[in-house]
Amino acid sequence: MAIHLYKTSTSSTRNGAVDSQVKSNPRNNLIYGQHRCGKGRNARGIITAGHRGGGHKRLYRKIDFRRNEKEISGRIVTIEYDPNRNAYICLIHYGDGEKRYILHPRGAIIGDTIVSGTEVPISMGNALPLTDMPLGTAIHNIEITLGKGGQLARAAGAVAKLIAKEGKSATLRLPSGEVRLISKNCLATVGQVGNVGVNQKSLGRAGSKCWLGKRPVVRGVVMNPVDHPHGGGEGRAPIGRKKPTTPWGYPALGRRSRKRNKYSDSLILRRRK
């Protein structure tokens, strides 16, 4: 979708850049309420993920990540905004009367036809196993476990690439730069996720950020020593350490956060950047 630039009529709209209007009129049988508890806190009520809280109430849209309506063509009826993700979603009317939401593929418009199955065309929005795709195909919504539904490359603008097939496995290059093996029988959707220009948006004011459930970010160097290892000192002072740390004293900016000795380590041929 196109990016709309605000006219500078007030201070809050200065330098603002948002998406052109995308309607949100979800079907009642494809949404349900969700209790957003925690706000970045663990079971003891301690903040473990900062800068979260508040925000507008949301209704969760049921997204079809499995694409298990096999060999039944569907038509794109609407393209809608989803408050739970940065990608758009589109409503599909299938030939058997089923109605489902899927992630909006880039370039898809209202009226286009999609289908999933084993012997379907390699065209945008179609879902099929990796074994039936030619090398170099751009894909998204990729399964890791057969039948579990897509788990990889689902964010706005995300796209992976099929680079090799050997034996029972296919080699993919993921959006993070990681190269890993996936079973050739797993399903994936052809094309790139839409809303590629999401990073070009500028909310323009703090209130718009609060609506999204994101709270202000405060630097540790301006805190007190009791609140952050970087805090304290007279006036503007350095952090007083060799390397930056988290509020809990662990190394920040570059520390590997992946758990060691995971079963999937053998499937990763090259780590993410």
Swiss-Prot record:
Residues 1-25, 224-273 are annotated as: Disordered. GO terms for molecular function: rRNA binding; structural constituent of ribosome; transferase activity. It comes from Phalaenopsis aphrodite subsp. formosana. Its main location: plastid. Pfam families: Ribosomal_L2, Ribosomal_L2_C. It is found in: Plastid, Chloroplast. InterPro entries: NA-bd_OB-fold, Rib_uL2_dom2, Ribosomal_uL2, Ribosomal_uL2_bac/org-type, Ribosomal_uL2_C, Ribosomal_uL2_CS, Ribosomal_uL2_dom3, Ribosomal_uL2_RNA-bd_dom. Belongs to the universal ribosomal protein uL2 family. Signal peptide: none annotated. GO terms for cellular component: chloroplast; mitochondrial large ribosomal subunit. PANTHER family: LARGE RIBOSOMAL SUBUNIT PROTEIN UL2M, RIBOSOMAL PROTEIN L2. Keywords: Chloroplast, Plastid, Ribonucleoprotein, Ribosomal protein. Part of the 50S ribosomal subunit. One of its GO terms (biological process) is mitochondrial translation. The keyword Ribonucleoprotein applies. The gene is rpl2-A. This is Large ribosomal subunit protein uL2cz/uL2cy. It comes from the Eukaryota.
